[in-house]
Amino acid sequence: MSRGGIQGFESERLSQILAARRLSQAQLAALVGVSPATVSKWRSGNQAPERETLERLAGVVNVTPEWFTRAPSAKVSLPLFRSNASAHVAARAMLEARMEWAQDVALALSEFVDYPTLNLPTRQFKEPDEITPDEIELAASECRDLWRIGRTAVPDLALAIEGAGVVLIREETGISQIEGLSAW
């Protein structure tokens, strides 16, 4: 930081919270009682909020002040959205930020819980466009064999994929244009 404020403020966390709460810098500034330029400086890393301001900021967005000083975990991949073309950029940004939080939680939990070993068929696709319906059918068949779940209806698919080592998060988002997303 070049000027003032608390030590260790992670500007990436501010970007995450803006996306996750679907707030503009100006809206957040009004809620916290600072200028939009100040929020811009926090976001760029040129300035950090003072302790009292950080507490107001945290209260407004419903996180602890300490959360803004935690380094974000490394992104595993860009999310792949299952959505129609009309899905708004802000909605995608919100879900991407929330996925990053889910990854943070899963990583923290892994310190206390042993996740099952990942047990999925391997594919060499580089782009989602390369995946054909036949490839999906083949992968589904391989999953059924790997997981020993037979060829009949799967009573609890979420339980089956969690047992195969996949971390599954289910959340009602209120964004009807996006049916789901994944990252690896």
Which residue stretches match the model-derived regions?
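Short juxta-domain linker segments that transition from a proline/glycine-rich
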Residues: 1-184
